[in-house]
């Protein structure tokens, strides 16, 4: 769950001595903060995806069908390969955005890339994890059901995936 609230400043007056920055620049300042927030959400999504992947990898090596671990079946091994590749790509995008931010460079496009891709693959990886676990993946006895639920929030917070696409499009079309 997340705590979400509406702030209303109707007929609100602020004394000159209490104004931070220049009057009218609040939106610009808020947008600058979003870059860092998007990197944070990308990191969160990446952690969820890694947790789902790690649990799936372990389970697929332990779970036996027809006298062999399910990881030996091509359908499962291909899922694991896709998951690992997507996680690696998301991590590189996230690290690139974080490095730019840490160096004080503009990172609007890169943070949107990272947030969009990492959050979307978090959902995909978590969904595949549930598939690998089968019916167990939907129960609270195993961790992947929580990864599955938690991953979706990452596609919403700090701007939905659709907003990230708008930001990316705006940046690449400049």
Predicted regions and their residues:
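Alpha-helical interface subdomain recognition
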Residues: 6-12, 16, 22-25, 31-174
């Amino acid at each position: 769950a997340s705590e979400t609230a509406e702030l209303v400043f109707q007929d609100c007056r602020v004394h000159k001595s209490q104004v931070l920055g220049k009057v009218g620049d609040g939106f610009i300042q808020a947008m600058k903060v979003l870059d860092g927030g998007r990197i944070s959400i990308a990191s969160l999504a990446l952690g969820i995806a890694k947790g789902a992947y790690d649990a799936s990898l372990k389970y697929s090596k332990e779970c036996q069908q027809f006298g062999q671990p399910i990881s030996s079946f091509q359908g499962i091994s291909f899922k694991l390969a896709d998951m690992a590749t997507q996680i690696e790509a998301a991590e590189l995008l996230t690290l690139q955005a974080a490095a730019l931010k840490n160096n004080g460079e503009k990172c609007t496009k890169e943070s949107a890339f990272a947030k969009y891709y990492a959050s979307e693959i978090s959902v995909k990886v978590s969904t595949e994890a549930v598939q690998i676990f089968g019916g167990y993946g939907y129960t609270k006895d195993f961790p992947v059901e929580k990864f599955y639920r938690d991953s979706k929030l990452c596609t919403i917070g700090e701007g939905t995936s659709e907003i990230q696409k708008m930001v990316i499009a705006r940046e690449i079309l400049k």
